[in-house]
Amino acid sequence: MARIELWNGDICDLEVDAIVNPANLSLWMSTGVGGAIKHTGGDAIEFEAVRQAPVPLGEAIVTTAGALAAKAVIHAVSLDRDRRTSGPVVDSAVRNAMARAREIGAKSVAFPALGTGVGGFPLQEAALITIRAVRDELDRSPSIDHVIFALRGAGAYRAFRAALAATADPSPSGPLAEREVVQ
């Protein structure tokens, strides 16, 4: 049974198989989550990512995790040239990030709230799109058994909690278990 977890904290601190970076088309990691990943994990992550650029909007690529606790970084291209995003792009980026995670044999994956920081996408809409996409992908492939949403701030946490509730399997023995971790 796959587990979805909400975690209030820094994605860079998580010991998981892969963390997801909300990337731009060029894969530069200067601000937001990408900047934090580069700062904590080292420049090698960005160097490896940029060598694979440009990457189409909604696609995802994998790099080393450098000095991070995670084993890999999945760069989900969710920001266009103007550093904006949309619902279909967030959906595609999440699904492709899950596909890359399966390809590298990841059992645990951590996501931030894609597109809501630099991209300025509405938090509630992003949460619902992301949770639905993750649930769909977990239903398709049981190889990933733990997805963590690393969220910063009460607003993001509430939005993802509401999205989990809105998309929950009504059967008592549903295919997913949810857990909240507040730090």
Map each language-model feature to its residues.
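Phosphate/ribose-phosphate-bearing ligand recognition and processing surfaces
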Residues: 81-183
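Glycine-/small-residue-enriched capping loops at alpha/beta junctions
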Residues: 1-103
